[in-house]
């Protein structure tokens, strides 16, 4: 019998069915090919929104720049980036008036952070534009390369290990007449293979020195590399995102630290909190508006959408905000914070890989790199691409486009939230001076606006005033995409509110299933996801039990570990059957060893090894948890690990799960194909970097880890630490005199070698 799906909804209130309309099952769409077109779209759109601004030329790089600040007031509803400085400053002043001391206190907190942050803060994050190689790299490698180049150019402040000192080097590097960098390149040769007698291509990796003059270096330092945003659901078109280089990152980090500190103190800010904490914060604002509007007032809520938030923001505006927020602070602090927006006002967008052409008839493919777009004949391109290139040409320098207005995605989320909240703050009656008033929530570009007034005309007037006030600071509320409802029903950052937040369970669908890390982690993550959804997302007991059974089934198929007494044949069944037969207590076998599943919704919080430990045969325990087992490259045993789970909205989030290290916690080896490419030198650097860091961690285990401050190098820190530890161990009798003498001798040798170097 076929089920008519509409019957499912007869008893379900509409708001609970919202999650079924979300595009969150199945694989998300990924982008293929280059992001060049999307980046050109972004650059062209951004300039279009600010087209009535003033054009100037950057004296250092020769880049043409458009400045829309204090431009004409809008005459229509088209999105525009003409923020008015005095309006922004006034909004800041009122925000401070409503929250006395907020800026002062946040500045003090940030100053402390600035003085304590180590440069390794910049190793967090994934792909980063590496200006030395002119392409993306893992953050740690990009930082190492930058520091290496700085040191070879006599910039050595960074050796203290403080981020602020590294930033001093960045500032100095911009004044240098030239910078010398080392680039990797590869040579290909055709040679005959001795064994097979076939011709093969041999690749060798070389390093060569290259000098960049001031202009070229500045362009690279100000460059944001662009990529296509992947796995974005519910969109027809892809869009470009940016990744800045190491010169910009440190400055951005400090600005965002200040803005985060301010956001934490603002009740309307949806950042930096998340999850249940965010829901509680939002519910408070709604409660406030509803209690005040009980009998006399109407209350309406707009589920807001802003048109092209980033592309209408302007770094010059952020500079004005920072100047105001830090106005009573010491000069060095104000200078450090103002550099990020200044660099963004002079930013260059790298256009990515360029275009790929193929000729069907001749079976030829050729890549047109972005550098060539400035002067290639446009007859090869289709109509829409031709228009894009024509428009962007005046802005091109060395394959990058000058992009002064606009912010690029995700750079100043916190600071732009402060700007948004400052407009929400103006809705208090003491500022509106009429019968209507508003409040709301802001989280980066997403907002919800609650307007109260005695009648419908008042509501309309309030919304209009909010809309116009936003226009004055470069925020464009979209009239097409925002909708208004009686307060009590709205959506904000994919949380649906209907007299309380409705669980939007479909959001979590992508994180169910087998992660593919290893047998041990996958089992743990799988049950933790189910447990967390029972706690946070209204996953009921029956559904959870079903999810668990599906997960175990999925897990067994993934790792081919069906129960030892099953009829299913896989490559592993022979071994698993043998194990099953020789095990006395079969309940003690892990699921990944063909054992039964003992999980139910009551014991999801217990790691499987612990759940079954008492049931295991002794020799099985010995094999399973044996750090000397030669077949396992062991991770050090940590009680809690972090997994990356993919919820449906927002970035991948980190989720803690209990980790018990067993022979199932293996780490897959790296794919060898990378070893034959030009990445090889980089890979070796990365491994060396990793080894040094691991060694350092051995000397300073996190429990006793007070970072050495003021010691000039890692080696010296480790040597002095080794001496102290050795003396303590010798005096307490833990090591013999000979061992103590040997350690001291090694330490002296290391110091001697450093002196000779």
From Swiss-Prot:
GO biological process, one term: symbiont-mediated suppression of host mRNA transcription via inhibition of RNA polymerase II activity
InterPro entries according to UniProt: RNA-dir_pol_NSvirus, RNA_pol_PB1_influenza
Region of interest (Disordered), ranges: 50-81
Catalytic activity: RNA(n) + a ribonucleoside 5'-triphosphate = RNA(n+1) + diphosphate
Pfam family, one: Flu_PB1
Main localization category: host cell
Annotated motif Nuclear localization signal, positions: 187-195, 203-216
Keywords, in A-Z order: Eukaryotic host gene expression shutoff by virus, Eukaryotic host transcription shutoff by virus, Host cytoplasm, Host gene expression shutoff by virus, Host nucleus, Host-virus interaction, Inhibition of host RNA polymerase II by virus, Nucleotide-binding, Nucleotidyltransferase, Phosphoprotein, RNA-directed RNA polymerase, Transferase, Viral RNA replication, Viral transcription
GO MF annotation, one: RNA-directed RNA polymerase activity
Intracellular or extracellular location(s): Host nucleus; Host cytoplasm
Subunit comment: Influenza RNA polymerase is composed of three subunits: PB1, PB2 and PA. Interacts (via N-terminus) with PA (via C-terminus). Interacts (via C-terminus) with PB2 (via N-terminus); this interaction is essential for transcription initiation.
Described purpose of this protein according to its UniProt entry: RNA-dependent RNA polymerase which is responsible for replication and transcription of virus RNA segments. The transcription of viral mRNAs occurs by a unique mechanism called cap-snatching. 5' methylated caps of cellular mRNAs are cleaved after 10-13 nucleotides by PA. In turn, these short capped RNAs are used as primers by PB1 for transcription of viral mRNAs. During virus replication, PB1 initiates RNA synthesis and copy vRNA into complementary RNA (cRNA) which in turn serves as a template for the production of more vRNAs.
The family this protein is said to belong to: Belongs to the influenza viruses polymerase PB1 family.
Name of protein: RNA-directed RNA polymerase catalytic subunit
UniProt source species: Influenza A virus (strain A/Chicken/Hong Kong/37.4/2002 H5N1 genotype X2)
């Amino acid at each position: 019998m076929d089920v008519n799906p509409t019957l499912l909804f007869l008893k379900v209130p509409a708001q609970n069915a919202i999650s079924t309309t979300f595009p969150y099952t199945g694989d998300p769409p990924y982008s293929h090919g280059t992001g060049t077109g999307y980046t050109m779209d972004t650059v062209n759109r951004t300039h279009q929104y600010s087209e009535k601004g003033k054009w100037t030329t950057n004296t250092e790089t020769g880049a043409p720049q458009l400045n829309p600040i204090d431009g004409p007031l809008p005459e229509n509803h088209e999105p525009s980036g003409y923020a008015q400085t005095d309006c922004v400053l006034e909004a800041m002043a009122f925000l401070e008036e409503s929250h006395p001391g907020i800026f002062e206190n946040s500045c003090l907190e940030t100053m402390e952070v600035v003085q304590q942050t180590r440069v390794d803060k910049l190793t967090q994050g994934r792909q980063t534009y590496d200006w030395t190689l002119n392409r993306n790299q893992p953050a740690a490698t990009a930082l190492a390369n930058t520091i290496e180049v700085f040191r070879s150019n006599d910039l050595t402040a960074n050796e203290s290990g403080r981020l602020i000192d590294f930033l001093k080097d960045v500032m100095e590097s911009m004044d240098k007449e030239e910078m010398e960098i080392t680039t990797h390149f590869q040579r290909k040769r055709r040679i005959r293979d001795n064994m097979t007698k076939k011709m093969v291509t041999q690749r060798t990796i070389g390093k060569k020195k290259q000098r960049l003059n001031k202009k070229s270096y500045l362009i690279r330092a100000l460059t944001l590399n662009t990529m296509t945003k992947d796995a974005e659901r519910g969109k027809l078109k892809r869009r470009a995102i940016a990744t800045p280089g190491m010169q910009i990152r440190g400055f951005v980090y400090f600005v965002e630290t200040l803005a985060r500190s301010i956001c934490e103190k603002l009740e309307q800010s949806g950042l930096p909190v998340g999850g249940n904490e965010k829901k509680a914060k939002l519910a408070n604002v709604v409660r406030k508006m509803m209690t005040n509007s009980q009998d006399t007032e109407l209350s309406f809520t707009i589920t807001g959408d802003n048109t092209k938030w980033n592309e209408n923001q302007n770094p010059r505006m952020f500079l004005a905000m920072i100047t105001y927020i830090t106005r009573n602070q010491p000069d060095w602090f104000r200078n450090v914070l103002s550099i990020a927006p200044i660099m963004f006002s002079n930013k260059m967008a790298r256009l990515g890989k360029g275009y790929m052409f193929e000729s069907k008839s001749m079976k030829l493919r050729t890549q047109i790199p972005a550098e060539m777009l400035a002067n290639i004949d446009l007859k090869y391109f289709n109509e829409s691409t031709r228009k894009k290139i024509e428009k962007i040409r005046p802005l091109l320098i060395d394959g990058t486009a000058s992009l002064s207005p606009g912010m690029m995605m995700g750079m100043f989320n916190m600071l732009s939230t402060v700007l948004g909240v400052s407009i929400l703050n103006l809705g208090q009656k003491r500022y509106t001076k009429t019968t209507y008033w508003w409040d709301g929530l802001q989280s980066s570009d997403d907002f919800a606006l609650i307007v109260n007034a005695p009648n419908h005309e008042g509501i309309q007037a309030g919304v209009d005033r909010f809309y116009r006030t936003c226009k004055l600071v470069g925020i464009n509320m979209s009239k097409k995409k925002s909708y208004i409802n009686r307060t009590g029903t709205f959506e904000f950052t994919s949380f649906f509110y209907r007299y309380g937040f409705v669980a939007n369970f479909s959001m979590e669908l992508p994180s169910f299933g087998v992660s593919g890390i290893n047998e041990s982690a996958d089992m743990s993550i799988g049950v933790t996801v189910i447990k967390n959804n029972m706690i946070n997302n209204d996953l009921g007991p029956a559904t959870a039990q079903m999810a668990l059974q599906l997960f175990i089934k999925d897990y067994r198929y993934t790792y081919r570990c069906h129960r030892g007494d099953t009829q299913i044949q896989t490559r592993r069944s022979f071994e698993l059957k043998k194990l099953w037969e020789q095990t006395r207590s079969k309940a003690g076998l892990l699921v990944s060893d063909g054992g039964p599943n003992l999980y139910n919704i009551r014991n999801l919080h217990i790691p499987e090894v612990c759940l079954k430990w008492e049931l295991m045969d002794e020799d099985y325990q010995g094999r399973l948890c044996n750090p000397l087992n030669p077949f396992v490259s062991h991770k050090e045993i940590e009680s809690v690990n972090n997994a990356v789970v993919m919820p449906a909205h927002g970035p991948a989030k980190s989720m803690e799960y209990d980790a018990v290290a067993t022979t199932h916690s293996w780490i897959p080896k790296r794919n060898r194909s990378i070893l034959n490419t030009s990445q090889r030198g980089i890979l070796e650097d990365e491994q060396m970097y990793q080894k040094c860091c691991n060694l350092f961690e051995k000397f300073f285990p996190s429990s006793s880890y007070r970072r050495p401050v003021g010691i000039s190098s890692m080696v010296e820190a480790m040597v002095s630490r080794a001496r102290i530890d050795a003396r303590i161990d010798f005096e307490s009798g833990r090591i013999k005199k000979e061992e103590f003498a040997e350690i001291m001798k090694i330490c002296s040798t290391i110091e001697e070698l450093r002196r000779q170097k």
